[in-house]
Structure formats: structure tokens, C-alpha cells
Amino acid sequence: GNKNKQLTCFTGAGVYDHYTPSAISSLVGRSEFLTSYTPYQAEISQGTLHYIFEFQSMMTALTGMDISNASMYDGSTATAEAVLMANAASKKASKVLVSETVDPKILSVIKTYAHFQHIVIEMVSQKDGVTDKQQLEQKLSAGDVAGVLVQHPNYLGIVEDYEGVADMCHANKAL
């Protein structure tokens, strides 16, 4: 057993090593973190609203991004909210490009959210298990794209090389 090497697993479909810091179990049991529901009474909500504001401010500072969101129920709804935010940040475009290598369950939630906001979800093909960057660049150049969604590692467990993708997006005014 001592001769075995511990390697990083990228099996795909969410089956990979997960690390949960020991503080998490104590934190998630606290009432203010137990739900993303915000009470309607202002005097009760102030603490909740304050820590959400602090979290969002810290996330924008850490990531260098202009916008951040909090209070998401799970990864799928958080991703769908990111699609809504990309659309809202764009003044003209209402299309979001999504790689075929994104988890189908996440894609299903995104499509549901997008449908009711009249956001067009357009898929970007994959080649050999990775996002087709040529097709992505071609679709971005149309100029009507609010954002691009990729997953890392992707649904197939592959760590894609996304170098240059952010530059492509920014050159075409997409998030």
C-alpha cells in the first residue's frame, strides 16, 4: 500500500476528490447560513443582508470581477444566475454560448431560467472531449453574445486549456 501513488482524479460527471474544510460543518449549521432565504422584516434582515454584502464585496475584490452574487442554493442555480447576470450586464446581446462539455443537469437548469428571460442558449461543440475553440471564436465574432459558459474540469473529467478564451470574450464584449 505504501508504494501506491495518490493521484488527482478527474473521472468526470462530478466523480472526483472533494475536500471539505473542517469548519464547514460548524458554519452550515448556523441559522444565518442554513438558508439563502432573506426574511422580509427589515430589522431581522439587516445581519443577513450585511454578511451577503460583505461576501459579495470580498468576492469581487478577490476575483477582480465587476459583479458577484450570493445566496445560491446549489451549483446549477448559481450557474443559471451567472447566465442571467451576463445577460443583464450586456446592453444589447441576449445570447449565451455554452460548451457541450458542461454538465447536462446544469444545462437543464440554465435553459429553464433562460427561457423565461428570453435568453438564447447556443451550444458550442466539443472535439475529443474539449470545447471547440475555433467554433467558439466564430460564434463570438457574430457580436451578439452576452456571455460564454465553460466548466472546469469539464463534465467528462478533462481539464481544458482555456488560455485565450477570456481575451476572445472581452474582444467581443462578452463575459
Report residues per predicted region:
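N-terminal entrance/gating region of PLP-dependent enzymes' catalytic architecture
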Residues: G1-E54, T60
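General beta-strand structural signal in soluble alpha/beta enzymes
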Residues: C9-G12, A61, I67-M72, V98-S99, ...
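Short, flexible micro-motifs
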Residues: V15, I67, E160
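Alpha-helical structural motif
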Residues: Y19-T20, F55, I106, D132
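Conserved redox-cofactor binding core of oxidoreductases
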Residues: T20, D74-T79
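Short, surface-exposed alpha-helical recognition segments that flank or form part
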Residues: E43-H50, A70, D74, P153
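Phosphate-binding glycine-rich loop
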Residues: F55-N69, E81-S94
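Conserved PLP-enzyme active-site core in the AAT-like
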Residues: T77-L175
